[in-house]
Amino acid sequence: KTPTQLQAAYQSVINTYGLTHIDFDVEGHWLAEAKSIERRSRAIAGLQAQARRAKRLLHIWYTLPVLPSGLTREGLGVLRSALRHRVDIAGVNIMAMNYGKAQAPKPTTHMGAYTIQAATSLHAQLKMIHREAGVQKTDAQLWAMVGLTPMLGHNDVKPETFTLGNAREVLAFARQKKIGLLSCWSANRDRPPAKPSANWASPKHTGIKQEVFGFSKIFRAYG
């Protein structure tokens, strides 16, 4: 599709559901698809321009993979492309999970700390790329752009485990910084296994001892 065609397709969805917020999840090989990224950025810029003319708000979020050290070069490229096309980015939701041994040397106890480190790294990166684009934002404004989505319990990368204690750490951090979003992957996994599972990471449970919706009960205190 051309940027104009893509914009029209997005606008159709926005109109159908009366959306004021939309999120673009960019991961895997799509992070390296420069033409796709540029086409999307141009389409999103057009959507926001159209919304402004209609005196409507359209909040744009991106969901991107992250390491404790921050977004990857490719992830930053997605945001830099958006800013080049004058997209007003409302926030960046980072998938705080599956870091690997090099980035997460204490995977069974420190996943909360790694999530907090990733958020702090993202904050610094957001400041950097907005300055590059000539856009000044306060620290508070930048924290409001930070979204956190940890993977509950067992992550796909064994033995990474995000615990209930980690969730409480992250909640305290979110409250302190007043971040824009606190979520999880995923609500349908927020339960203990009904029986011992051969799979380390399951789409049906966290793999750890907890009550049903134990993580949700912690995170719902943020709002």
Question: Which role does the model predict for each range below?
Answer:
Residues 147-150, 180-186:
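Conserved active-site loop/cleft motifs that coordinate metal ions or position small ligands
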Residues 160-181:
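Short, low-complexity, polybasic intrinsically disordered segments
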Residues 187-192:
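A short, acidic, flexible beta-alpha connecting loop/helix-capping segment that sits on the rim
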Residues 1-133, 137, 141-167, 193-207, ...:
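Chitinase-like catalytic core of GlcNAc-active glycosidases
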Residues 13-22, 174-184:
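Catalytic domains of carbohydrate-active enzymes, especially glycoside hydrolases
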